[in-house]
Design a protein with these regions (language model features):
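Conserved phosphotransfer cores of two-component systems
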Residues: 43-45, 67-75, 98-101
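Active-site residues of response regulator receiver
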Residues: 9, 53, 81
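Acidic, metal-coordinating helix/loop segments flanking the phosphotransfer/catalytic sites
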Residues: 31-49
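Two-component/phosphorelay signaling modules centered on CheY-like receiver
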Residues: 12-30
Length: 130
């Protein structure tokens, strides 16, 4: 069965590029360039993985993470980040739901295609809730 991914990034070039890469590797990908619209359209128990950019206007990736987890506690979510600073910040703040996120759930930009596919496959197959 085809794995379904939701990708949210405020930069259309990024969503376009990553969507094409993932679809070329057999994934079905829905994209949004606005976190508020993504949240309104989110379907619980539909996606195998959600990929969120951290730095977005209106609602950043951390806030969107918390809102998705409120709707769908078992959602597997990872983050795109241009810097490791965000990982450290998030690790210290924790999420509003009292969980910390493992470093494996952060995907560093610029993206290496092979590493991206390996990391996403690992996350989707990981039985542990992050």
């Amino acid at each position: 069965m085809t794995k379904k991914i939701l990708l949210v990034d405020d930069e259309p070039d990024v969503t376009f590029t990553i969507k094409n890469i993932l679809e070329d590797n057999g994934f079905q990908v829905d994209t949004f360039n606005d976190s508020t619209t993504a949240l309104k359209s989110y379907k619980s128990n539909y996606y195998d993985l959600v990929i969120l950019d951290i730095k977005m206007p209106k609602m950043d990736g951390f806030e969107l993470y918390n809102k998705i987890k409120e709707k769908d506690p078992k959602a597997k979510i990872c983050f795109l980040t241009a810097t490791e600073i965000y990982y450290e910040k998030f690790r210290k703040l924790r999420t509003g739901l009292g969980k910390t996120i493992d470093e494996d759930y952060f995907i560093q930009k610029p993206i290496n295609i092979e590493d991206l596919i390996k990391k996403l496959t690992f996350i989707m197959n990981n039985k542990n809730d992050e």
